[in-house]
Amino acid sequence: MNQRLQRLADQIQRELAVLIRDAVNDPRLTGFVTISSIKVSPDLGYADVYVTIMEPELNDAMTMSNHEESIKVLNKAAGFLRTELSHSLKTRTTPRLRFHYDEVTARGNYMMDLISKAVIKTEENESDEQENEE
């Protein structure tokens, strides 16, 4: 991605984060929406927005159906968000927004949980071995 597209993607990310937080009032969107990254097409026709959604009431353990519902809500609000975004962008056209669930972040969190469990198990085994030696 060239520098111009990257600057535009960064600006869209900043503006969208505020718009989603303040302007999207859909009750089905209950978690905290975090924009992981944005990829803008070279012709500025589309912007693929990758988001993660954290649900504090569920201890961040949202199911895939929860994520799909949240992505549907965001995609339905994409036209409104695009219109609002066009007021702050200094481009002739505003890219169409397509929201996607960012599985990379979720996969990273899953791997961190596995590592934490492995470390705890290793520490337990080491303490058991020390007790057996005594």
UniProtKB/Swiss-Prot annotation:
Note the Pfam families from the entry: RBFA
- Record SUPFAM superfamilies: Ribosome-binding factor A, RbfA
Record function comment: One of several proteins that assist in the late maturation steps of the functional core of the 30S ribosomal subunit. Associates with free 30S ribosomal subunits (but not with 30S subunits that are part of 70S ribosomes or polysomes). Required for efficient processing of 16S rRNA. May interact with the 5'-terminal helix region of 16S rRNA.
What family is it from? Belongs to the RbfA family.
Q: GO molecular function terms here?
A: ribosomal small subunit binding
GO cellular component terms, alphabetically, are: cytosol
By its UniProt entry, which InterPro entries does this protein fall under?
Answer: KH_dom-like_a/b (IPR015946), RbfA (IPR000238), RbfA_dom_sf (IPR023799)
NCBIfam families in UniProt: PRK13816.1, rbfA
Q: Tell me the subunit arrangement.
A: Monomer. Binds 30S ribosomal subunits, but not 50S ribosomal subunits or 70S ribosomes.
Which GO annotations describe the biological process of this protein?
A: maturation of SSU-rRNA
* Keyword Cytoplasm set for record: yes
Q: What is this protein called?
A: Ribosome-binding factor A
